[in-house]
């Protein structure tokens, strides 16, 4: 860490103030708060990750995707004896989880826009042989009628490395449950789950009366093998898209950028 950077970061931290009126939900491994840079009035997110959970991949993804509009901009990254601190762009508007909770379900037109943008974001990340590995409603920030931001890169993984059942179990693909090597299909399956949640208003495999003890990975795997329920209020294109994204047999599933983006629901 050179002297100029130390001086700059010390000055920045001397000029910020925590905004207690803006609440953020902490992630699995990091605590987050909104801070205001007093001289400019700009809001940032300060993310602190305990040193035992720190990985090199999160700052790397920020660096690789720094010019991509669908990813969060990183301003500063520094590591102390106890934690890694990231200073990130603050995006007003909240995440898709809160948005869906408020609106119950989302129109096909708005879902198409959201999913189309996520498809482009994932393809950009995959071009570096990196998967997000934890795509879910909570990890997509949404400025309504404008754009999405894919966030939280702490569980990103390199394609074709050995996998484990990390991430959020409700979004795990059949292949991930079988502990096959990490591949892009992990993210495309999760996108199918997310699309279903937006259009239908609930998860395709987790029932409202499930508790965490009953809904284990074996139950999830059994339910994934059953055909999806058909909904008459969906268009034929939307129904076919969900079925193709969540086909249990990967040989018949949409699990590449080219097949996803060309589907009639998105085109």
Swiss-Prot record:
InterPro entries: Kinase-like_dom_sf, Prot_kinase_dom, Ser/Thr_kinase_AS. It is an enzyme of class 2 (transferase). ATP binds at residues 24-32, 47. It comes from the Viruses. It catalyses: L-seryl-[protein] + ATP = O-phospho-L-seryl-[protein] + ADP + H(+); L-threonyl-[protein] + ATP = O-phospho-L-threonyl-[protein] + ADP + H(+). Its EC number is 2.7.11.1. The active site is at 134 (proton acceptor). The keyword Transcription regulation does not apply. Keywords: ATP-binding, Kinase, Nucleotide-binding, Serine/threonine-protein kinase, Transferase. Residues 18-266 form the Protein kinase domain. SMART domains: S_TKc (SM00220). One of its GO terms (molecular function) is protein serine/threonine kinase activity. Belongs to the protein kinase superfamily. Ser/Thr protein kinase family. This is Serine/threonine-protein kinase 1. It comes from Heliothis zea nuclear polyhedrosis virus (HzSNPV).
């Amino acid at each position: 860490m050179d002297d100029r950077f130390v001086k700059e970061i010390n000055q920045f931290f001397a000029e910020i103030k925590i905004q207690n009126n803006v609440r953020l939900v902490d992630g699995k491994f990091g605590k987050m708060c909104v801070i205001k840079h007093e001289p400019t009035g700009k809001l940032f997110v300060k993310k602190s990750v305990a040193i035992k959970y720190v990985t090199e991949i999160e700052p790397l993804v920020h660096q690789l995707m720094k010019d991509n509009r669908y990813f969060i901009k990183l301003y500063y990254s520094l590591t102390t004896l106890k934690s890694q601190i990231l200073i990130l762009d603050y995006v007003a508007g909240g995440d898709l989880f809160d948005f869906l909770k408020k609106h119950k379900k989302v129109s096909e037109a708005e879902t198409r826009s959201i999913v189309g943008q996520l498809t482009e974001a994932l393809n950009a990340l995959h071009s570096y042989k990196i998967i997000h590995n934890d795509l879910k409603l909570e990890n997509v920030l949404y400025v309504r009628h404008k754009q999405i931001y894919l966030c939280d890169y702490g569980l990103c993984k390199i394609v074709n490395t050995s996998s484990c059942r990390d991430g959020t179990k409700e979004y795990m693909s059949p292949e991930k449950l079988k502990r096959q090597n990490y591949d892009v299909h992990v993210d495309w399956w999760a996108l199918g789950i997310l699309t279903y949640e937006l259009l239908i208003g609930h998860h395709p495999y987790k029932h409202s009366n499930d508790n965490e003890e009953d809904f284990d990975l074996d139950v999830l795997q059994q339910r994934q093998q059953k055909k999806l329920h058909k909904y008459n209020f969906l268009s034929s294109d939307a129904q076919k898209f969900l079925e193709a994204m969540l086909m249990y047999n990967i040989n018949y599933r949409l699990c590449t950028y080219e097949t996803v983006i060309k589907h009639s629901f998105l085109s």
